[in-house]
């Protein structure tokens, strides 16, 4: 039941994927971007992830500038969770300044920060998605999957949450050694604090698959 601040989540299910799986959407890769874990207005994330910003205001401005430098007004952005902290003023300020049409896949922090009034500001708000971009099947979730059927037939899984960065020594670091080469952390800490285009993700995953195949000959 709703608690008055949040509304019940309903997964959008349009179309049908391979083997009868639900396929949420199909998109043109020329206008698609991915990102995660911006943590707008979250001061503690600067120390927790050793982000190179003096304060939360500087961080917010850098994230907004980087976002708008690559994302146009009519582009599509899949944000894989932990979008923003704060209340109405903070969320409104950020959403008013970001380019693009944003689909939000809910992260663990969004569960407590996302309010009902913000749902209409996104193209959709869901727990996870299964999309197709230029015939490439992609699973989107806030957290990495330990296993998923798509790993065996070329599908990707994009995620956030783990804040991958250089010399990552967090508690999730050992687990990341178990992921498939068709998985990738699109979070800002792993990608110069900037959304990635579909083509950028494609090149990264192709390189990961190539390296995996080379190491397992």
What are the residue ranges of the model-derived segments?
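Acidic, histidine-bearing metal-coordination/catalytic regions of metal-dependent phosphoesterases
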Residues: 6-54, 184-217
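Core catalytic region of metal-dependent phosphoesterases/phosphodiesterases
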Residues: 26-29, 33-35, 40-133
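Compositionally biased, intrinsically disordered low-complexity regions
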Residues: 6, 17-22, 89, 102, ...
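Exposed boundary/loop context
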Residues: 8-13, 74, 100, 153, ...
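Conserved beta-sheet core of the metallophosphoesterase superfamily
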Residues: 119-213
């Amino acid at each position: 039941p709703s608690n008055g601040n949040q509304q019940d989540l309903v997964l959008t299910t349009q179309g049908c994927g391979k083997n009868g799986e639900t396929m949420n959407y199909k998109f043109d890769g020329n206008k698609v971007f991915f990102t995660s874990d911006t943590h707008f207005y979250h001061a503690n994330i600067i120390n927790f992830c050793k982000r190179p910003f003096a304060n939360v205001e500087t961080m917010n401005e850098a994230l907004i500038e980087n976002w708008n430098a690559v994302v146009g007004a009519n582009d599509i952005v899949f944000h894989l969770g932990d979008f923003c902290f704060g209340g109405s003023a903070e969320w409104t300020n950020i959403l008013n300044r970001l380019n693009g049409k944003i689909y939000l896949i809910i992260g663990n922090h969004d569960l407590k920060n996302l309010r009902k009034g913000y749902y209409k500001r996104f193209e959709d708000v869901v727990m996870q998605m299964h999309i197709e971009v230029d015939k490439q099947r992609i699973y989107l979730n806030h957290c990495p999957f330990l296993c998923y059927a798509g790993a065996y037939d070329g599908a990707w899984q994009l995620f956030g949450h783990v804040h991958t960065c250089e010399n990552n020594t967090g508690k999730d670091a050992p687990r990341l050694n178990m992921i498939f080469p068709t998985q990738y952390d699109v979070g800002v800490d792993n990608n110069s604090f900037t959304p990635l285009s579909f083509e950028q993700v494609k090149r990264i995953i192709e390189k990961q698959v190539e390296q995996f195949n080379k190491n397992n000959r």
